[in-house]
Amino acid sequence: MLCVSALLAGSAAPAIKNMAVIASAGSKLQDVPLAELAKLCKGAQKTWADGRNFTLVMKDPESPDMHVAVQKLFGMPGGEVKSAIAKLNEARTVVRVVESDEDLLRTVEATPGAVGVLDVYAINSAVKVLRVDGKLPFDVGYALKGN
């Protein structure tokens, strides 16, 4: 009986989602270094190597699902990132925060140069998953893996 209650208690903990960096299906992007993504997210680099404007599309940066991505891409805790995003967006919208997975997918598909951070199980055929430092979301050592 004790084992069953321990199992039930353990299953109540929120699962860490596997997040993916996505781009529109027609994008030429394939593999993006984490260091380049971080420079783009922090505003140190404004455009992709081909000159297209960079836009990051994400859901609430303070949500538990986004914790690892915010840490890796912005180098700060979720509680501080909203003010950093507001500052980045003063001249041009660099980071778009959307309400749902569907909004994120639509925005990435419709915005040239956009990438999004999304739960791998929400991906559809309108987008493709980018490698980050040569790795996909389920590969060992993937940069945005929560555990």
Predicted regions: what is each one?
Residues 13-147:
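Exported/periplasmic ABC-transporter solute-binding proteins
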Residues 1-9:
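Bacterial N-terminal signal peptides
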